[in-house]
Amino acid sequence: MKDAVTDHPATVGSFRSAFSSWGRFRTEIFGGLVTSLALIPEVISFSIVEGVDPRVGLFTSFVMCVGIAFTGGRPAMVTAAAGSVALVMAPLVKNHGLEYLVPAVLLAGMIQIALGLGGVANLMRFIPRSVMNGFVNALAILIFLAQLQHVIHVPWMVYVLVAISLAIMVVWPRVNRVIPGPLVAIVVVTALAILGHIDVPTVRDQGELPHGVPSLIIPDVVFGFRHFGVIAPYALGAAIVGLIESLLTAKLVDDITDQHSDKTRESWGLGIANVASAFVGGQGGCAMIGQTMINVRHAQARTRLSTLLAGVFLLVLVVSLGEIVGQIPMAALVAVMFVVAFSTLDWHSVDPRTLRRMPLSETAVMGATIIATVVTNNLAVGVVCGVVGASVMFVRRVAHMVTVEQVDHSPETSRYRVRGQLFFASSNDVVFSFNYTDPAKTIEIDVSDAEVWDSSAVSALESIAYKYRQRGKHVQVVGATGASLERLRRLSSLTIVDE
């Protein structure tokens, strides 16, 4: 059932609803705290992937969490320095240098603002369910695979701590539902490691934590214009990848919370957050679906306050409590992400009984989305491949739904009725569905039950008429209405008869 606090999508309403009760307020606080802890190792890892100092990623995440809490269209969604954007920007840093990064992030944010105001979010309706399932399942696989580096070639005690963490997260909800299991697991395992002097990899081993708050900088706009040709492709790629991942994450959270979010606002809000991150020398980012799942699904957070607190707690933890945070064993955080991966996977979509009922084409599209995403390690590429595959499958199905039937025949006139959608994919089959040895003097092509969509369909009808004219027949098109009639008159020289 929909949570009462999710009925206010506006910013003020969402923040106010966080204070509607002590239980809700407590949930938002715990959600922000657990999410901030889960952000630290992921952000540090993605910073290393992008080729920047881990402090850059942590400051970026603080600014973007705080920014999106006010500008975003999906309350409780977590936005930070994400891996998908890091993968796009990494070649820019590697091939051209760090000085190109901030102008590229600034440009990417401006592109996202423009696309958001231009209504790009409306394109979400063209992403089918099979692609969404593939996206979610691929994400679960990527989250799982990203943790393997932390459990390979490590001391054997790491596996013990992972097992303890997993056990706590499984058992704890049966004992207490107030405090999130992931937070309990992190605290308990950290205490065991410190008190037991257990030598295992920690958060500190992933990179240096900052010792102060981020300082404002003025992006070198002149430098950006001078090297626009270099940064533009990377900025455009990061903008599109970030938007796709954020909008898909927002849709996923909509399904979990049973609430519709403002995708247009999320689009330009993400752009504003990226622009803001550029003013602290940030690396750019987008929605972090793993951390969002921790916040929304595990912590049950529902308002903007949890997102705001995730950013605030992140900064406080790494600056004020950096020494303590640095001692958190990676085993605890890996276990948290394992649970996130397990719960993120749409098990119903891969159930053999479901797969047997689903059309083979939809299963193939879901599989293609998963494979493309995992192989490229890029969710946006997987979604694009899935949408293209789904489009091809749909076009193929619709193309075979066109029929031609001879409905009237006399020595003088023979009428053929065309039913279905006439467009580039179906037009070729239509041409070969007529009887060109028909002895009638006049051939009528009845399109009253058909829709003429493009020039390929018009060209096919002209080809049919030409074949009959070569045999001395008179050809006329009847039954055309609306847009089909307009296209036939504008694009062809066919004889069109109104009935």
Predicted features along the sequence, with ranges:
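Hydrophobic alpha-helical segments within and immediately flanking transmembrane helices
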Residues: 42, 59-68, 82-93, 310
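Short, non-helical or kinked segments that cap or interrupt transmembrane helices
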Residues: 50-59, 73-86, 121-135, 178-184, ...
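The feature marks cytosolic C-terminal regulatory regions of anion transporters and related permeases
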Residues: 344-493
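Membrane-embedded helical hairpins/re-entrant loop segments and their flanking transmembrane helices
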Residues: 17-26, 30-33, 38-75, 225-305
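Intrinsically disordered, low-complexity non-transmembrane regions of multi-pass membrane transporters
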Residues: 1-26, 200-217, 399-417, 472-499
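Hydrophobic residues within alpha-helical transmembrane segments
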Residues: 33, 63, 82, 106-110, ...
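Core transmembrane helix bundle of multi-pass membrane transport proteins
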Residues: 1-33, 38, 89-90, 94-257, ...
